[in-house]
A protein has these predicted regions:
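Cytosolic juxtamembrane N-terminal segment immediately preceding the first transmembrane helix
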Residues: 2-28
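Linker/hinge segments immediately adjacent to helix-turn-helix/homeobox DNA-binding domains
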Residues: 3-4, 26, 30-36, 40, ...
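Central cavity-lining transmembrane alpha-helices of secondary-active solute carriers
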Residues: 50-71, 246-252
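Transmembrane alpha-helix termini and helix-breaking/packing motifs in multi-pass membrane transporters
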Residues: 64-72, 154-181, 336-353
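C-terminal ends and interior cores of transmembrane alpha-helices
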Residues: 86-105, 271-284
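Hydrophobic core of transmembrane alpha-helices in multi-pass small-molecule transporters
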Residues: 108-129, 287-303
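Cytoplasmic helix-loop-helix junction between adjacent transmembrane helices
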Residues: 124-148
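Helix-turn-helix DNA-binding segment
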Residues: 387-439, 447, 457-466
Length: 466
């Protein structure tokens, strides 16, 4: 386990904070611009370029999961995985950009472009799964906030790359995954948590419901990207407004410092997507970007929620993170693919946008209530109580602290939490800032493997049974 002295400092710490942002920018540039994609009018393919990318992305995550089962990291080492990721990512980005904008696009019926897309997608999947594996082990209680910072930074980088000339934008796109790898290397020095004291029972995790809800929500997102499209100017405004919404949400997370980050990321997803759909039909044409921007915000909250919860639950259940995290991303991309194909078909049929929006909102309501509500999220983190007559709280807290690698200060906070003390009381008692107290509580929850105070109390009650 890393110690405080090995943590990244200065520029390295900044890179570790926003390292994922370079990956997200890379994906946004590929999906939302023509930097790496050819003109749709000159493409030799019989399906849309976004659908082609999503198909390759699904296959990329499937291959990464398979490589994880074959112990790729054990065979070629940590450095080998990083080198392979970098080579595939750069080769894929440069290959896509060069082939897309030259006569090479028609060679072999587009075979060169397909090869470049395959390299891009596999490198993209390897990089994101590497980040997910790292997040699952971090001891800090604000992984969700770091995700929000990275995604917010990605909007700034996205507009920067879009403003570059084509050749420079292609070069920048190839450098983005390398920058993310550098940030990932620095983030490796951050403190890690030990295996959780009371791991989750995998049978208690509503896997099927979660995956179906994930598929449905991403399918709705895919439909929205094809049915509710505007002009280039409105798309720019939509991304700008979506970025501002995410910036405000990130600021809220840092000010409020919620100890339950999974729930904090879950709450805005359905309201943002549903309200975005509704606003598109209420607002005048010149203001449509507001609804589209809110949907972008909701879609990216969904992405971050998937990444945070799937990596954390895999670690707590002691399942291979590559398998759980990679499968969740595969299902998400498959949902986006189906939604994209359905959206294109509906657009070609000139289907009623009001009817499409109504159906999408209904699907979101079903996904967020019947399939995977906040109560299902609670089940993934709940520790079932087994009351004990033993009341030796100090000994129990000390045992939990030793097993989970809590610091001396966190042990003090744990002792107060065990007695039902609130964060403001703990701050006053220990003469520390309220935000510091909340960060200690959040870190304790993450290291111990719970997400609320009741589960922590239940775990302390169970301690004498060991």
């Amino acid at each position: 386990m890393a110690n405080a002295s090995s943590e990244p400092k200065g520029g390295g710490k900044l890179l570790s904070f926003v390292g994922l942002g370079f990956w997200q920018t890379w994906w946004m540039v590929a999906m939302c611009t023509d930097v790496l994609l050819p003109n749709p009018a000159s493409t030799p393919f019989h399906l849309s370029l976004s659908a082609l990318l999503l198909i390759a992305s699904c296959l990329g995550y499937a291959v990464v999961v398979l490589l994880g089962r074959l112990d790729l990291k054990g065979r070629i080492g940590f450095g080998g995985v990083q080198a392979l990721t970098g080579v595939l990512s750069v080769a894929g980005s440069v290959g896509m950009g060069v082939v897309a904008h030259t006569g090479l696009l028609t060679v072999g019926g587009g075979a060169l472009f397909v090869i470049a897309v395959a390299a891009f997608s596999l490198g993209n999947a390897l990089l994101l799964v590497s980040w997910g594996t790292l997040w699952s082990t971090l001891a800090t209680g604000y992984v969700g906030r770091l995700l929000c910072v990275s995604y917010t930074a990605a909007f700034v980088l996205f507009f920067f790359v879009r403003a570059l000339p084509l050749s420079a934008a292609i070069a920048a796109s190839a450098l983005l995954p390398l920058a993310s790898l550098v940030g990932y290397s620095f983030a490796q020095r951050a403190p890690r948590r030990a295996p959780v004291h009371q791991h989750a029972t995998w049978d208690a995790v509503p896997v099927a419901k979660a995956l179906v809800a994930l598929f449905v929500a991403n399918a709705v997102w895919g439909v929205s990207q094809k049915v509710l499209t505007g002009t280039s100017a409105s798309v720019d405004l939509a991304f700008a407004f979506g970025g501002l919404c995410l910036l405000a949400f990130t600021a809220y997370l840092f000010v409020a410092a919620p100890t339950d980050e999974p729930t904090a990321l879950y709450r805005p997803i359905l309201p943002a997507l549903a309200c975005g759909f509704a606003l598109v039909f209420v607002l005048p044409p010149e203001d449509l970007f507001l609804g589209e921007g809110i949907m972008i915000f909701g879609g990216y909250c969904l992405d971050m929620f998937i990444m945070l919860v799937s990596s954390d639950v895999a670690f707590r259940a002691r399942k291979p993170v590559v398998l759980v995290f990679g499968t969740a991303l595969f299902v998400a991309r498959a949902g986006s693919l189906l939604g994209t194909l359905a959206g294109e078909a509906l657009a070609n049929m000139q289907a009623s946008t009001v009817g499409v929006a109504f159906a999408c909102i209904a699907c979101l309501v079903v996904a967020g209530t019947l399939l995977f509500s906040s109560s299902e999220l609670d089940r993934m983190y709940r520790v079932h109580v087994e009351p004990s007559a033993d009341s030796l709280y100090e000994e129990k807290c000390a045992a939990i602290a030793a097993a989970c690698g809590l610091t001396a200060r966190e042990l003090e906070v744990l002792g107060l939490l065990a007695r039902g003390r609130s964060a403001p009381f703990i701050a006053d008692e220990l003469c520390i800032a309220l935000g510091t107290a909340k960060n200690h509580v959040s870190s304790i929850y993450r290291k111990v493997g719970v997400r609320d105070r009741q589960s922590l109390h239940n775990m302390i009650e169970r301690e004498s049974l060991r």
